[in-house]
């Protein structure tokens, strides 16, 4: 995947200890410092996906309760291994969310269910649907940006 993530600094920002004036391309596994003390880790978990993960290295957190942020390109991997964008250590397998023209779809090597029905192949998703397997369950929820 030959895509890059570009950071545009609108205030005091460092990447790997170097001040950013304007824009910079983020490299895998780099540290971003916003202001004087907010530290974020940037990681592209697998070369097979342009999606990336931001994790909080300092004690700062946004107003909503989150542990990290996924910057989703075309795919988002959820599962037990280090290549996953969302780490779920207890899951027996990985699940992939795929962005298409009509929205998100889901797929896995193991049997998964969408709202209780067996998902075959790449299965389209909509907000509110529940995706589950033998040892996991999650709900796809649309975030209202106006809140």
Protein language model annotation of sequence segments:
Residues 28-48:
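Short, structured interface segments
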Residues 1-29, 65-135:
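Forkhead-associated
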Residues 41-59, 139-147:
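Short, compositionally biased
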């Amino acid at each position: 995947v030959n895509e890059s993530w570009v950071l545009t600094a609108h205030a005091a920002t460092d990447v790997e200890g170097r001040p950013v004036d304007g824009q910079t391309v983020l490299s895998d596994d780099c540290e971003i410092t916003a202001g004087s003390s907010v530290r974020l880790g940037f990681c592209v978990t697998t070369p097979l996906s342009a999606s990336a993960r931001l994790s909080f290295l300092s004690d700062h957190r946004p107003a909503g309760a989150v542990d990290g942020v996924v910057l989703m390109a075309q795919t988002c991997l959820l599962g037990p291994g280090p290549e996953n964008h969302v780490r779920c250590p207890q899951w027996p397998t990985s699940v992939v969310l795929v962005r298409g023209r009509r929205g998100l779809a889901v797929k896995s090597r193991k049997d998964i269910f969408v709202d209780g029905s067996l998902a075959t192949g790449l299965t389209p998703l909509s907000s509110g649907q529940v995706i589950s397997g033998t040892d996991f369950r999650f709900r796809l929820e649309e975030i209202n940006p106006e809140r």
